[in-house]
Regions:
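Unchanged
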Residues: 47-70, 80-135
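Acidic, metal-coordinating catalytic segment for phosphate/diphosphate chemistry
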Residues: 1-17
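Residue-level preference for beta-strand/loop junctions
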Residues: 10-12, 38, 86-88
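Short, solvent-exposed loop/turn elements at beta->coil junctions and helix N-caps
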Residues: 6, 75-81
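A structural signal for short, well-ordered beta-strand segments
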Residues: 18, 74, 92-94
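Nudix hydrolase/Nudix homology domain
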Residues: 35-39, 111-163
C-alpha cells in the first residue's frame, strides 16, 4: 500500500522542531522564501545522518536563535506525504540552559550568497499564537490544545539504538 506512493527520487527526511517556553510564551521563527509568503514555525530543521533527535533539536535551536538548551522529551510526531516528498515531523520539548536572549540566527543550508530565509525570532503568547500562521497547522492546533499543561512531554522517546 505505502509502496504505491513511493517514487524513485522521492525526498525523504526527518524534521525536528523545538518547543521552548518562557513565561507562557513560545519561541517562534519567521521564514520567508522566494516562492511563498512569510510564515512562522518552531525553531528546527532536518535531522542529519548520524544525529539523534535530541542532538538535532538542540543544534537547530542554537543555529536559529542562539539559545543553548537541553532535550526534555518528544511532544508530537507527525507525517507529511506530498508530491515528491515524505517528511516525518518530530516536535521536541527543550529547556534553555542559560540566561541568553534569543537572537536571529541563520540557516546553514542556505547558500552564503543567497538571501537569508530566517527573518525574525520572537516570543509569542498563546493568545498571539491563535492569530499567527504557524506551520504545520496540526502542530499549531496541538500547541493550543496543550497550552494549559505547559507542553510537558510524555515518556515516548526510547532513545537511539545501535542495532
Amino acid at each position: 500500500m505505502g509502496k504505491d506512493r513511493a517514487a524513485p527520487g522521492m525526498d525523504f527526511g526527518v524534521r525536528v522542531a523545538a518547543v521552548v517556553e518562557r513565561g507562557g510564551a513560545l519561541l517562534l521563527v519567521r521564514h520567508k522564501k522566494p516562492d511563498r509568503d512569510a510564515y512562522w514555525v518552531l525553531p528546527g530543521g532536518r535531522l542529519e545522518p548520524g544525529e539523534t533527535i535530541p542532538e538535532c533539536a538542540v543544534r537547530e535551536l542554537a543555529e536559529e536563535t542562539g539559545l543553548r538548551a537541553s532535550f526534555s522529551g518528544v511532544l508530537y510526531v507527525g507525517e507529511f506525504l506530498r508530491e515528491g516528498r515524505h517528511t516525518i515531523d518530530v516536535v521536541a520539548r527543550v529547556t534553555p540552559t542559560g540566561d541568553g536572549e534569543a537572537v536571529l540566527g541563520s540557516d546553514p543550508e542556505v547558500a552564503p550568497d543567497a538571501e537569508p530565509t530566517l527573518r525574525e525570532v520572537r516570543w509569542v503568547s498563546v493568545d498571539e499564537l491563535r492569530g499567527i500562521e504557524l506551520l504545520p497547522d496540526s502542530v499549531k492546533r496541538r500547541l493550543l490544545d496543550d497550552a494549559g499543561d505547559g507542553w510537558e512531554p510524555e515518556e515516548i522517546y526510547l532513545g537511539g539504538a545501535g542495532g
